[in-house]
Amino acid sequence: MDQMQLNSKPLKLSTIVGYGAGNFGYGFVTQMITSYLVFYATAVLLLPGSLIGLVVSLSIVWDAISDPVMGYISDNTHSKFGKRHLYILSGTFLIALTNIMLWHVKIDIAVWIKFIWIFSSVFLIKTFVTVFITPYAALGAELSTDYNERSKIQAVKTIFFLTALIIVTAVCMFVFFRPTPEYELGQLNPQAYKNIAYTSSLVMLLTGLWTYFSTKSYKTEAVVYQDKLALSEFVGQIRYSLKCNDFRQIFIGYLFTNLASAIIGVVGLHTFTYTFYMNNYKIGIVLGTQFLVCIFAQPIWVKIARKIDKKAAVKLGLMISIVGCMMLFVLVLLRRQVMVHYEYMIVYAIVIGFGTSGLFSLPLSMVADTVDQQELETGERSEGIYYGMLNFGYKMSQSIAILILGFVLDMIQFNPNINIQNDFTSMALGAVLSIGSLLSFVLANKVYSSYNLNEEKVEAIQRQIQLKRVSK
């Protein structure tokens, strides 16, 4: 059946929720690696930090490069499962299996064996995550041709992802890392990581299968099927995607917004700890508030995008985020007062949480609109390439931020061996977080200004596509 005709009816809520559920399992497993792998490998397995840093850095690069490759493979797959569901199903099981493998390293074996185990496990799980997530993301663009329903699909998907992040970073600390007679610090207990691995793999299986069965009636075939995958064709499709002005603006804008997110991830904890001298309870309150606002604001941003269109909604979100960064900089200047009244940081968390909420989901919806533009111009649909490239930019921005900020920490004389940093370092940490994020949001706002698609243009494109298909 014609893909455009197939997806013209409004989706059932059960389908949208079922699709979004897959992002919960993905978020659960990947956030476990982000939050706990370095500590597990260094503090529990006693591996050198330099080796683990090498593994993490190389895996991020591999993860980024493999995304567009997987997108190309998926775009050109011809299978009874469709071009996405074969990988969603196989990726679900392979992630669950390799995730358990990653967290089941014997402590008493040689260091080089532990390193090889961690190295191979990380690269395997990163590979299978790509096998799952790139076709999964592309499927989200194929479920509906409705301009506003696409925003709803991405909002629900984002809610699942952010919920997984909160559970892994906060709830798991209380549930799995309880002190025992043998391990007063629960996070040093090897069995705790095995238990989380069993739990996260089960979650991945349940949510991955939920997504598969909820969306299996939306199987699609390649609009133009390549009998043989070719490097020249792959490179050509990447070049075409980046030549497309509207996709290029999303790609670069999304890269900048995620650069701000990476800055928060790298130096956020440093700032909360050494600039504002907040304990784990206060940090948890602030970050928890930010995540919760981000989750509950998703439906609001869907309504805002419906009312003022997606581009205007994204720019509004960026402006609110810029205001949040300005607030943070003022709080850094008044850090001595904030040390006494950390509640000021909650106000910042609400503003930045609301502002960034739409930046998680709306650009993903906009990518689907640019693929319609591609089909009109070329007769091909390459959702896999487009979402793979978006993931590539996102992950490379993370890698760049980690690399640069590592040097920045040295430049501002951060000393990890002391609990109280000097005034210059305390101030500089807050400045890096607030000003660095602000500049990223400002650059993203400038880039998105050149995006041209809106609801009227996308609907006109879809009508022209339909006429071309009918005339064939």
Where are these regions (language model features)?
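Membrane-embedded alpha-helical bundles of multi-pass transporters/translocases
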Residues: 2-472
